[in-house]
């Protein structure tokens, strides 16, 4: 679970340094994808959902690595294709988070333990709504520039709250998981 938490941390939290059009993200999202992949391997015995999430983590890791390199070299674009690819990447991030919640729900049922998945799901819903709102505003933003800018700020702040809530819920889930006895292999 430690890798799951840190994977989401690297995936959702951005600290960027910008110099002359070159952007250095100090917490590269592809590192988060790699940590998630490792976490999925560790939790594979808890639920097959974790195994099924691995290709999504790999694909998202490749995409975010290419974006990270492009930002570093200053060749990233602000085109419509970038926006559409960003929407797809956000959808994959949300799908991975949803899959983790579902996998942990199965582990809760199997182990008869609370792993804080209800709080994780509520935080995930905040992320889902804010992501949809941000991209909808971004796509219609050219027509209503001043209103769209104000709405985007509100949605981004709500998204930040959602990220914090989700990371706190994953952290609590991690702590609850760590005190569980080792999973017994069924003969």
Give the label of every model feature segment:
Residues 1-5, 47-58, 120-123:
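Membrane-interfacial loop-to-transmembrane alpha-helix junctions, especially the N-terminal start
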Residues 1-39:
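N-terminal topogenic module of multi-pass integral membrane proteins
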Residues 16-19, 69-77, 136-147:
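Juxtamembrane "helix-exit" motif on the non-cytosolic side of transmembrane helices
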Residues 29-33, 63, 67, 86-102, ...:
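Generic alpha-helical transmembrane segments
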Residues 29-56, 68-71, 97-111:
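Internal transmembrane alpha-helix with an interfacial aromatic "cap," most often the third helix
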Residues 50, 102-133, 175-187:
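Membrane-helix boundary/juxtamembrane motif in polytopic membrane proteins
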Residues 77-89, 147-156:
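Non-cytosolic membrane-interface motifs at loop->transmembrane helix junctions
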Residues 97, 129-187:
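C-terminal transmembrane-bundle signature of multipass membrane proteins
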